[in-house]
């Protein structure tokens, strides 16, 4: 049974909008959750407990934040919209374990904030209804920094979530799948209808769970170069990797035979398309490329 303090209801959200004269900014992708059942599903999937520190991005009016505060040891929330800070100060006033930072998550010193506010937590989870227009940059920024994050349970546009969780050979499988699955084990939690948001977004949503691997799926000496090589295989999805790499490498057209030799020595048929290659296949290509100095980009 809901208590009257839950923010994630249409009536409470409307009351807060009226109280603060708040208007949604489309440019910030603001869609507030108004269904506590969805929030409870997110909390359950997160496996957070009294020793967990949580990073939240885009808390809005605090509908998810208050539930996180009830379950976690500490919550560190980043909110870019200055107009929401007094709202959050109001709605989260009963909780002394929440810190709200009024900064752009892509510009904030997250590592320093975690060290300052979550240092006594046994594990750290990212739990958020992410701004859909910058979901990918946010996740990659967090994954590629030296921050001790154990996992992510995040809401995002369904199409993007399916790409993160895509299997080899599927239409959704691409370079984003490779980067995210390199760092994490991915799974789908639930699909979320538009009706549980205010205002309703134009796209369907999904909650995905990404648990940090103790070691990356493959070992490479330069992650950035590895990801660039993998991304090039998807430049034109209908083309073979042979064609895509001819376009990717400097003077690739003049090195057709070298590219074929490189692919074959890595055990990869040049006629295959990028979506048929596993992360392990791309790691073989990356290592084998070191034997071919002609292949520059």
From Swiss-Prot:
It catalyses: adenosine(1518)/adenosine(1519) in 16S rRNA + 4 S-adenosyl-L-methionine = N(6)-dimethyladenosine(1518)/N(6)-dimethyladenosine(1519) in 16S rRNA + 4 S-adenosyl-L-homocysteine + 4 H(+). One of its GO terms (cellular component) is cytosol. SMART domains: rADc. Disulfide bonds: none annotated. It is found in: Cytoplasm. S-adenosyl-L-methionine binds at residues 31, 33, 58, 79, 104, 129. GO terms for molecular function: 16S rRNA (adenine(1518)-N(6)/adenine(1519)-N(6))-dimethyltransferase activity; RNA binding. CDD domains: AdoMet_MTases (cd02440). PROSITE patterns: RRNA_A_DIMETH (PS01131), SAM_RNA_A_N6_MT (PS51689). Belongs to the class I-like SAM-binding methyltransferase superfamily. rRNA adenine N(6)-methyltransferase family. RsmA subfamily. This is Ribosomal RNA small subunit methyltransferase A. The gene is rsmA.
């Amino acid at each position: 049974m809901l208590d009257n303090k839950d923010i994630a209801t249409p009536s409470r959200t409307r009351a807060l909008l009226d109280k603060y004269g708040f208007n949604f900014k489309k440019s910030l992708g603001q869609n507030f959750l108004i269904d506590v059942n969805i929030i409870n599903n997110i909390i359950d999937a997160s496996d957070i407990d009294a020793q967990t520190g949580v990073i939240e991005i885009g808390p809005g009016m605090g509908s998810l934040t208050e539930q996180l505060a009830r379950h976690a040891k500490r919550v560190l929330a980043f909110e870019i919209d200055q107009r929401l800070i007094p709202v959050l100060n109001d709605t989260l006033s009963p909780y002394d374990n929440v810190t709200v930072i009024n900064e752009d998550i892509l510009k904030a010193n997250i590592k320093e904030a975690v060290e300052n506010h979550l240092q006594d937590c046994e594990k750290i989870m990212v739990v958020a209804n992410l701004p859909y227009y910058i979901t990918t940059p946010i996740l990659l920024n967090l994954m590629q920094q030296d921050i001790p994050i154990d996992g992510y349970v995040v809401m995002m546009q369904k199409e993007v979530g399916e790409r993160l969780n895509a299997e080899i050979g599927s239409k959704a499988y691409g370079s984003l799948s490779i980067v995210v699955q390199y760092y994490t084990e991915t799974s789908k939690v639930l699909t979320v209808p538009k009706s549980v948001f205010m205002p309703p977004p134009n796209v369907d949503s999904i909650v995905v769970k990404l648990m940090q691997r103790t070691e990356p799926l493959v070992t490479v000496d330069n992650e950035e170069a590895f990801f660039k090589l993998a991304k090039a295989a998807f430049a034109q999805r209908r083309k073979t990797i042979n064609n895509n790499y001819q376009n990717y490498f400097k003077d690739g057209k003049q090195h057709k035979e070298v590219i074929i030799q490189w692919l074959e020595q890595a055990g990869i048929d040049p006629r295959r398309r990028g979506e048929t290659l596993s992360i392990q296949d791309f790691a073989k290509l990356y290592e084998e490329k070191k034997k071919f100095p002609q292949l520059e980009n």
